[in-house]
Each structure stands twice: as structure tokens, then as C-alpha cells.
Regions:
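Short S/T/G/P-rich N-terminal loop/turn motif that feeds into the first structured element of a domain
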Residues: 1-71, 78-87
Length: 87
């Protein structure tokens, strides 16, 4: 399934978040069920991400952890499940 994510980073600069997100130990947490992905900067402290997710249960579990951590840092996540459009 394809998802779009919008992440407001609070006071964290995009570059700091990107460095944290791409660390090998953090990427390993998503291995096997997440990706490919496309990441873009949205303003000075925002992220737009498109990702293919093959295990929605793991996504739910992962996002519980992420949202708990992010709330302590003033960050906010919005997730959108993308559906095909036959127009």
C-alpha cells in the first residue's frame, strides 16, 4: 500500500531530522516492510514523504513509537493512505 506522510518538525531543522532518519540503525527498524520511499523538504522544518508499506501492522506499531517520541519534541505527523484513481 502507498502512503503519504507530512511531518511538521517543530523547532528541528530538516537537515537534523534527515540525518537522524537515515542513520543505519534507524533504517534497519524499517527494513523488510517499508520502501521504496521518496523524501522531500517542505519548508524550513517540514517533510513530505511517499512510501510503500507492505505490512500495515508494523506501520501501526512503528507509528505509535514515533508519535510518542515526536510529541515530546514538538513534532506532528499526518498519514494519508493513497488509493488509485481511475480517472
Amino acid at each position: 500500500m502507498n502512503y503519504a506522510f507530512h511531518i511538521h518538525l517543530g523547532d528541528m531543522p530538516y537537515e537534523t531530522w534527515y540525518e537522524m532518519y537515515t542513520k543505519p540503525e534507524n533504517a534497519q527498524k524499517r527494513a523488510g516492510w517499508w520502501g521504496p520511499e521518496h523524501i522531500g523538504k517542505s519548508g524550513p522544518n517540514g517533510v513530505v514523504m511517499l512510501a510503500q508499506v507492505s505490512d500495515e501492522e508494523k506501520l501501526t506499531e512503528h507509528m505509535k513509537f514515533v508519535r510518542e517520541m515526536a510529541s515530546k519534541m514538538g513534532m506532528h505527523h499526518k498519514i494519508y493512505k493513497l488509493a488509485p484513481d481511475s480517472r
